[in-house]
Amino acid sequence: KESSAKKFQRQHIDSSGSPSTNPNYCNAMMKSRNMTQERCKPVNTFVHEPLADVQAVCFQKNVPCKNGQSNCYESTSNMHITDCRLTSNSKFPDCLYRTSQEEKSIIVACEGNPYVPVHFDASVAASA
């Protein structure tokens, strides 16, 4: 079974892909990373930074998670990310996404030993 840490990498890490202006990026990536198999995942964020940099966020700024848990961490620097949002006229299995490039801090939930990201909680405009 896929571990939470591996699932996080599959769903959110695209270190090789530089943030692309390709409008089809999300359509292609959501499919190739298996997020459109049983249904169209409505929203997903890809992070275009080295895995080690994303894992390091677990030791940065501790913040509360959206669900109230206390194991979330905000990156102390901006990261290049791509937000994928399902378009309103999408019908499974034809999942169509809007691709938007951003530079923001990311918030991830971490657990385990080694302590690694297992859930992407949010992205926020970096605090200046």
UniProtKB/Swiss-Prot annotation:
Single GO biological process annotation from the record: defense response to Gram-positive bacterium
Cystine crosslinks: C26-C84, C40-C95, C58-C110, C65-C72
Region listing for Disordered, in residue ranges: 1-25
Gene3D superfamilies linked to this entry: Ribonuclease A-like domain (3.10.130.10)
E.C. numbers: 4.6.1.18
Subunit architecture: Monomer. Interacts with and forms tight 1:1 complexes with RNH1. Dimerization of two such complexes may occur. Interaction with RNH1 inhibits this protein.
Residues of the active site: H12 (proton acceptor), H119 (proton donor)
Function of the protein: Endonuclease that catalyzes the cleavage of RNA on the 3' side of pyrimidine nucleotides. Acts on single-stranded and double-stranded RNA.
Pfam families, per the entry: RnaseA (PF00074)
Enzyme class: lyase
Reaction catalysed by this enzyme: an [RNA] containing cytidine + H2O = an [RNA]-3'-cytidine-3'-phosphate + a 5'-hydroxy-ribonucleotide-3'-[RNA]; an [RNA] containing uridine + H2O = an [RNA]-3'-uridine-3'-phosphate + a 5'-hydroxy-ribonucleotide-3'-[RNA]
Name the record gives this protein: Ribonuclease pancreatic
Subcellular location field: Secreted
Positions with a binding annotation for substrate: K7, R10, K41, P42, V43, N44, T45, K66, R85
Cellular compartments per GO CC: extracellular region
MF annotations from Gene Ontology: lyase activity; nucleic acid binding; ribonuclease A activity
Biased composition (Polar residues): 14-25
Homology family: Belongs to the pancreatic ribonuclease family.
Keywords, in A-Z order: Disulfide bond, Endonuclease, Glycoprotein, Hydrolase, Lyase, Nuclease, Secreted
